[in-house]
């Protein structure tokens, strides 16, 4: 890419979607052979052409005593640092590092608008450990120049009924000026060492770049809420033979929701939501198993009501008998818009977990699809009061059932799911494996949502 190209701002929501996953998806000819991945060749992950004939760990069985107590060596000018997110100044350091370096394009017209509340939600769920927030500092100045995080997560593969204590790896970020120092592979090895010391040997992670070897691939889709604003900042274009007024009319949403009994989730709803989600997740091949305190954290942000959180929004549907029949949730992570005379922020919502008891009524699948479409239409409506401009979801879960009806458009960004030190059979991500097009009206096998 030329320097001139680098300065061009993204011109479509699809470009935005690519950056959300820290890299662009690659076409088949661009996928390198295993021998070219010097680092991943040394790691317990399947190669691209490996035939999966059994399910289970790849590496030989170890114990924490087999793992060194000392961190991996770094280049002499750097030192390891355990980042204490309980301290505001260190939280600010992580914010600054990610804000300035998490998006590749130095001249990008937007930045992730993280907040302390978002980091506390994303990085401090029940069971979190300070030592799993690893940083690298410059010895001479103490400046934080790299960061990687792991949080505890319990995975379940429903076909085999195997439950896997794991971690989710996220927020791997190296300062742009130090990308040639090969810090990222060392950081992955170091976070692996720290996690292994707690007798955890598997991890789940995602990325837009194709590495050896995805267990599932999902496609980004997006639904404009404020089309006019997206057009103003250059993320939406005016299609041929369309007018601005026509586009506004196409994406217009009502001001009120339609589902009877819909309301914000409260902590008192936790038991019913837990049972509903637990049963609903039996539909998918790979899911996260939640304890109730974990679910309270992820759906309520550790608050007593949904309205207390500025990050996660959760809604339930209560019937006339006081039973909860449905719920949905989404989280908010806006972008700061730079160098735009009219707008300084882009509101973005990301679909999170949901469930409906209509899914359990096998005699009428069409009713379930209609119910999902109605629920997600209401999710779009509720997002307007949080100044959301575009609502994103993947082709995971049962999202293909409503994506078209709710006017989500397929982006050209993809998100690949990877299991570290575990092999399992490929899982459908709601898209055709060859064409990568969305498979409408067909469930995916991916029931776990990563930030």
Swiss-Prot record:
UniProt: tetradecanoyl-CoA binding residues: 37-40, 172-174, 180-184
Keyword Repressor: no
EC number: 2.3.1.97
Major site of localization recorded for this protein: cytoplasm
A GO MF label: glycylpeptide N-tetradecanoyltransferase activity
Keyword field contains Transferase: yes
Intracellular or extracellular location(s): Cytoplasm
Coiled coil: none
GO CC terms of this entry: cytosol
Keywords: Acyltransferase, Cytoplasm, Transferase
The organism's place on the tree of life at top rank: Eukaryota
Subunit structure: Monomer.
Function: Adds a myristoyl group to the N-terminal glycine residue of certain cellular proteins.
PANTHER family: GLYCYLPEPTIDE N-TETRADECANOYLTRANSFERASE, N-MYRISTOYL TRANSFERASE
Protein family according to the UniProt entry: Belongs to the NMT family.
Name of the protein: Glycylpeptide N-tetradecanoyltransferase
Annotated source species: Debaryomyces hansenii (strain ATCC 36239 / CBS 767 / BCRC 21394 / JCM 1990 / NBRC 0083 / IGC 2968)
């Amino acid at each position: 890419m030329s320097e001139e190209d680098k300065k061009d701002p993204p011109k479509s929501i699809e470009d935005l979607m690519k950056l959300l996953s820290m890299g662009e998806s690659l076409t088949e000819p661009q996928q390198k052979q295993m021998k070219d991945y010097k680092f991943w060749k040394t790691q317990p992950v399947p190669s691209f052409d490996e035939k999966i004939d059994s399910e289970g760990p790849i590496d030989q069985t170890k114990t924490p005593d087999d793992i060194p107590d000392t961190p991996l060596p770094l280049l002499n000018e750097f030192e390891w640092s355990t980042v204490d997110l309980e301290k505001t100044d260190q939280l600010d350091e992580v914010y600054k590092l990610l804000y300035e370096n998490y998006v590749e394009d130095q001249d990008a017209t937007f930045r992730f608008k993280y907040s302390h509340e978002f980091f506390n939600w994303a990085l401090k769920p029940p069971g979190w450990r300070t030592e799993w927030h690893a940083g690298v500092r410059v010895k001479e100045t103490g400046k934080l120049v790299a960061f990687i995080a792991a949080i505890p997560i319990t995975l379940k593969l429903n076909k085999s009924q195997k439950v896997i204590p794991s971690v989710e790896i996220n927020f791997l970020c190296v300062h742009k000026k130090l990308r040639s120092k090969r810090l990222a592979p060392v950081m992955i090895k170091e976070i692996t060492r720290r996690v292994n010391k707690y007798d955890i040997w598997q991890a789940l992670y995602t990325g837009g770049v194709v590495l050896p070897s995805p267990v599932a691939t999902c496609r980004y889709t997006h639904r404009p809420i404020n089309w006019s604003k997206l057009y103003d900042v250059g993320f939406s274009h005016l299609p041929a033979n369309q007018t601005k007024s026509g586009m506004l009319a196409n994406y217009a949403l009502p001001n009120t929701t339609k589902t009877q009994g819909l309301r914000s989730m409260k902590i008192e709803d936790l038991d019913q939501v837990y049972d509903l989600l637990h049963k609903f997740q039996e539909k998918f091949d790979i899911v996260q198993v939640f304890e109730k305190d974990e679910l309270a954290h992820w759906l309520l942000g550790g608050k007593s009501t949904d309205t207390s959180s500025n990050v996660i929004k959760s809604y339930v549907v209560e019937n006339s008998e006081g039973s909860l029949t449905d719920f949905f949730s989404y989280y908010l992570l806006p972008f700061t818009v730079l160098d735009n005379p009219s707008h300084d922020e882009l509101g973005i919502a990301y679909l999170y977990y949901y469930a409906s008891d209509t899914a359990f009524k096998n005699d009428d699948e069409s009713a379930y699809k209609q119910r999902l479409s109605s629920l997600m239409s209401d999710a779009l409506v509720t997002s307007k009061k949080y100044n959301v401009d575009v609502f994103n979801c993947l082709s995971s879960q049962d999202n293909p059932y409503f994506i078209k009806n709710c006017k989500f458009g397929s982006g050209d960004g993809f998100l690949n799911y990877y299991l570290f030190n575990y092999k399992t059979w490929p899982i459908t991500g709601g898209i055709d494996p060859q064409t990568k097009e969305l498979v409408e009206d067909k469930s995916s096998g991916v029931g776990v949502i990563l930030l």
